[in-house]
Amino acid sequence: MQDLGYGAADGSLFYGIGTSMLRLIVGLAIAIAGGITLGIFMARMETVNQTIGSLVLGLQSIPSIAWVPLALIWFGVSDAGIIFVTAIGAIFAVTINTYTGVKNIDPHYIEAAQNMGAKGSQLITMVLMPAAFPYLISGFKQGWAFAWRGVIGAEILFSFLGLGFLLNVGRQTIDVSQVIAVMVVIMGIGILVDGLVFKRLENKVMSRWGLG
């Protein structure tokens, strides 16, 4: 706790939290946008699903940290590389959950909407996404967890800012108390995000769908 106090006093802890969270938000936003788009295409177009469906499942099994070498080659030691690792670690969880959610929508529900004139982006935003919302929330929650691990892991390996960097500084200086203190902060942020964001969303979904 003393190390947390020192970090808070000199601002390094708050700066590290802000840096990591910014990278996380950007990477997760990219993953959510890309994952929803890809998942809907896979669910609505069988040729797309047959072409890349198995590939998406395979790519999801790759740990985020395994993308670090490619990130370094393509982006160098930069924020873009860390954001890439963050986004790629989360996008496939969002994709798979979106695909599952859209696939589980009653076809008659979609046909009724189309008969009423819904098509294109209107069909997606007004019909498909609301109907698949419970699955989307599950995908966002999984994606957040993967993204948070990805950003911290990438920062440990090639960053000069962020919570992962502070962890690495503790390792290099053999400062066990600093390492543990930063780990506590990382865990605390995870608990807060889960409780303040995803628990509330899940409760709303359960209430909306009559599950709670």
Regions found by a protein language model. Name each.
Residues 1-29:
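Periplasmic/extracellular loop-to-transmembrane helix junction in inner-membrane transport proteins
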Residues 10, 14, 18, 48-52, ...:
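Alpha-helical membrane-protein architecture signal
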Residues 26-56:
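Transmembrane-helix boundary motif in ABC transporter permease subunits
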Residues 57-93, 100-101:
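Generic hydrophobic transmembrane alpha-helix motif, especially the helices
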Residues 84, 88, 120-154, 177-181, ...:
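Transmembrane alpha-helices
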Residues 97-139, 163, 167:
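Short cytoplasmic-facing helical segments at TM-TM junctions of multi-pass membrane proteins
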Residues 163-201:
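Hydrophobic alpha-helical transmembrane segments of polytopic membrane proteins
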Residues 199-212:
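Short cytosolic juxtamembrane segments of multi-pass membrane proteins
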